[in-house]
Amino acid sequence: TASADQIQECFQIFDKDNDGKVSIEELGSALRSLGKNPTNAELNTIKGQLNAKEFDLATFKTVYRKPIKTPTEQSKEMLDAFRALDKEGNGTIQEAELRQLLLNLGDALTSSEVEELMKEVSVSGDGAINYESFVDMLVTGYPLASA
């Protein structure tokens, strides 16, 4: 996984005229230079979601951190992981536990990214989050680009 500095350096290399934007046609090359290997279908999906001729650094960071898999594959992997953590088998995870996972595992999020994400999450009175709804939100309903 590339560091924030490596992502920024990569973006600057592809930002040939130093205007803070990179052509959408360069997205695949930029991602590959950081070790991602998106298929053409995955790139077309991302380009369709972005719906723009160019992207900025914030959008590139978001795209880089997003898993490059189909929504069905993403959902299955995330649900399998949550089910493994769900000792009671009740389909929920505590808000505090989810925050810790997001801050510390895999491509960890920053505190501000976790706060933004948690604003979108429905939490029950006892602090529980239905992880199937959470996964569905991440895969289908959470904005790809922070505009």
Swiss-Prot record:
- Binding positions for Ca(2+) 1 per the UniProt entry: 15, 17, 19, 21, 26
Q: Where is the EF-hand domain?
A: 2-37, 73-108, 109-144
GO CC terms: myosin II complex
Q: Does the keyword Hydrolase apply?
A: no
Q: Which InterPro entries match?
A: CALM/Myosin/TropC-like (IPR050230), EF-hand-dom_pair (IPR011992), EF_Hand_1_Ca_BS (IPR018247), EF_hand_dom (IPR002048)
Give the record's keywords alphabetically. Acetylation, Calcium, Metal-binding, Motor protein, Myosin, Repeat
- Any idea which positions bind Ca(2+) 2? 86, 90, 92, 97
The molecule here is called: Myosin regulatory light chain
Origin organism is: Physarum polycephalum
